[in-house]
Amino acid sequence: RIGHAYLFCGTRGTGKTSVAKIFAKAVNCEHPVDGSPCNECETCRGITNGSAMNVIEIDAASNNGVDNIRQIRDEIQYSPSSGKYTVYIIDEVHMLSIGAFNALLKTLEEPPAYVIFILATTEPHKIPITILSRCQRYDFKRISIDTIAARLSELMEKESIEVEDKAI
């Protein structure tokens, strides 16, 4: 079951926005493979290159006013022109003003079935509890260098690619 609001928390560079875009692809992909996006259909390519009309990325650091959120509230009345869902990715959501959070709350309380909100933040403690309680929260952590190196080694072996240990 797909929720209508997600909160991705973690320090910079942990992949919150990247995962949000992959999720947007997964729910809208025309030819999913075992629940994963194909990355080849028109929808997946549009999300990758930023031209998809049904995936809207908003930087709350520069669009933090109540009018910005009210505009979203007006836009969500229209179903997506392509794909099953309209996905709003609101990055640095903790930067919203109190008024903007209140407007967002109204939107999160009764969203249309075809809208998904993904809120991303480095500072979840700055988000009102009323917003937190309406989201499924996921905490992102940095992956250690050793874990990355082990995975790279595994992939090189699987693909029969010879590589020096120093290169990994």
Name each model-derived stretch.
Residues 141-168:
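Conserved C-terminal "switch" segment of AAA+ ATPases
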Residues 1-133, 137, 147, 153, ...:
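P-loop/Walker A NTP-binding region and its immediately flanking N-terminal helices
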